[in-house]
């Protein structure tokens, strides 16, 4: 999320998990002709008043390029998975893009959540050349801040983008993001010393945070997120070779493939104890893979802790 003040997607999820336009002019729907009846085509209309930090216009060519750039295997882009199932991304006009999927796709917003980079800056650095792009160390985006200093592993300084496309934003003239160090030092710099205004997603023990709060200048705000920490066990057989591979998806683990075994393991999980003694205030015990926003948190998934139960 560190690039969010500088680079933007077509859409993003708000605090309620609803998709809202950023660089897109509107959310596609059946009513406005943006979604096809067969669930395979999405038409994105783009804002017309958006400029890159270097003054060049943001257009459909950039959106098409971001797809081409990300899915090139030689680039090894971490965003490539968000384009899974996309057959093609086509330019309709200067500010309209058509995305065609190989099959009906309900999560068609995912590829639109990719933070955009400018074609005119990165076109010469496709594939394996992507690592050599000078803009990797001084990114050019459309966001509310533009980078004036970037020291990898240490510091990013951003200044207000006077041409930002959303009115009355941002609210600060200068942004300084400090990297490096460890989580405890970051918490201390904000909560105790007051050297920085904000630290996000602190992986620090709750007791340590409480001590910092008691005599410090800052406070801890706990906001449940949508991510879940869990242990995943492979239900394939590691001792059997299928098509030249062990633990092949077509094989079945002799123990873990038994539903009764998995049910028993669920009953042995003391989620409340893990929440209290490991995560403290910052943890929310849940049997769901998606815990937030609340409307996606299923109440029908069993989470009983009972070592005496029979399955």
Question: What does each model-identified segment do?
Answer:
Residues 145, 284-311:
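Structural transition elements
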């Amino acid at each position: 999320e560190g690039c969010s003040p500088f680079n933007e997607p077509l859409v993003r999820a708000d605090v309620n998990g609803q998709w809202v336009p950023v660089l897109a002019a509107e959310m596609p729907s059946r009513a406005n002709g943006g979604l096809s009846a067969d669930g395979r085509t999405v038409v994105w209309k783009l804002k017309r008043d958006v400029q890159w930090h270097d003054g060049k216009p943001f257009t459909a060519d950039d959106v098409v390029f971001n797809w081409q750039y990300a899915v090139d295997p030689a680039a090894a882009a971490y965003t490539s998975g968000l384009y899974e199932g996309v057959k093609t991304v086509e330019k309709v006009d200067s500010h309209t893009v058509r995305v065609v999927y190989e099959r009906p796709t309900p999560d068609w917003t995912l590829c639109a959540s990719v933070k955009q980079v400018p074609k005119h800056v990165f076109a010469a650095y496709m594939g394996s050349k992507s690592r050599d792009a000078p803009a990797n160390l001084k990114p050019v985006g459309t966001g509310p801040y533009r980078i004036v200093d970037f020291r990898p592993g240490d510091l990013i300084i951003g200044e207000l983008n006077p041409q930002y496309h959303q009115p009355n934003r941002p609210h600060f003239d200068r942004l300084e993001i400090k990297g490096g160090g460890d989580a405890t030092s970051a918490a201390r710099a904000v909560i105790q010393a007051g050297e920085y205004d904000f630290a996000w997603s602190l992986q620090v023990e709750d007791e340590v945070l409480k001590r910092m709060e008691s005599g410090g200048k800052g406070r801890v705000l706990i906001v449940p997120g949508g991510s879940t920490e869990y242990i995943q066990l492979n239900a394939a057989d590691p001792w059997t070779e299928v098509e030249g591979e062990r633990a092949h998806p077509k094989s079945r683990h002799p123990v873990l493939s038994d539903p009764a075994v998995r049910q028993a393991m669920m009953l042995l999980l003391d989620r409340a104890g893990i929440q209290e003694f490991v995560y403290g205030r910052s943890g929310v015990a849940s049997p769901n893979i998606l815990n937030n926003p609340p409307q996606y948190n299923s109440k029908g998934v069993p989470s009983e802790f009972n070592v005496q139960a029979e399955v």
